[in-house]
Amino acid sequence: IRGAFPSVVLVGMGVLLVARIGWLSDDSLITLRTALNMSHGWGPGFNVSEAVQGYTHPLWFLAWLGVGWISGQWIASVILMSLVATAAALTLVLLLPCERRIRFALLMLLALSNSFVEYSTSGLENPLSHAVVGSLMVLLVRQREVIERSFHGLAVGVVLSLVLLTRFDLVLLVAPLFIFWFIRASRSVRIAAVLGVLPLLASWFYWSLVTYDSLLPNTFYAKRNVNLSFMELFDQGFFYLRTSLAYDRAGGLLLLVGVVLTLAFMKPLAVASSLGIVLYLTYVASNGGDFMVGRFLSVPVYLSALSIAVSLEGWSLEPLVQSFRQNRMNSLLVRRFIGPPLLLVLSAILISSATAFSRQQSERFNWERPASRGIADERPMYVQRGSGFMRYFSEISVAVKSTYDPRTEDSSIVEISRRANGWPTRKDSEIQRPLTVRTTCGLLGGKSIISG
């Protein structure tokens, strides 16, 4: 118990840090509206009686649908899911077989990573992505202990299917890891893995095809249906990644160290992880990136932290520490002349821009300026509009209530919660199509919840 106490404290502090700057993005409310319509009898689409898969994260959608329907608290449920998934992701880092001080250092760097911390909430699938990717890595790392057990193969297959159902493009991130494991596994374990993957994926694809007449989300086809050349898309996507790294120096450091250690130690799982990260980021760039700075960097940054732990397995800081303790001159040089300046420079690099530890959480740049090329610093912008978790916590007695008043235009997280909790149920005698249709451009999710 005594040995686990520091780990529990660190994970708890990490969750509190994430909750402190937690927020709800407008895109997540598109998923929420679909879940509300489906749970209240209006059909499995964003618009009433129109079956279109407007969300990109089936497993996150199903989890939100289930927890929200059972609890009746739709915003509280996504806050809870995000924080639980974040706690799981941080705990999984501590389960990897490397020295404890290294694991603690990785948690600190993740806490300084803007992309990881900011998108551990947002209402999007990122926290679940962290948790399922981390679960897969832990299972693969421990393959040497149970590689001949069919149950282990079944577990790997099930977790892989959860990764894919969380977001289908994550297949590029984890495919090298799975292929490496699959080649080394015995025949019985391979069969078990396939049996673990197929049922969940087949069930979802069947339901999606019957319900939406499509295997993939509508957003996949929307992103590909643009009148732009590959080089134009890649240029914008590369700019997106560069901008995201500029505002997430800790994340960039994790990615860089992950690559360096992979090349230095050449551990197979670390090599597979780095290859997956390269494939995934190349795919993000080829699609033109995104408008939310850092969103598609959080999972690669987290996987890179896991890769570092794998690379440093069996490597200990203790001999280095002991040698410095025994040599007084080296110890004096490090403590007085090398350590403090190095720590100061590293801190200046990491904390020169706003992080989760900063009190100031205003927008780091204006998305409307031409130099931003449409990329926005989403979290501070929505917090200023009242979509931060702290606003919800401070008015929780009001937020848990139910209301349905289409006259109000308040789109804060508190009003979104009240409106979602009071979502009307369609009766059999009611018509399926609305009497009025509203069109809007921008902030579609929030406006759709407020308008009902």
Q: Across the structure, where does each feature detected by a protein language model lie?
A:
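Membrane-proximal envelope and lipid/glycan-remodeling enzymes
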Residues: 1-452
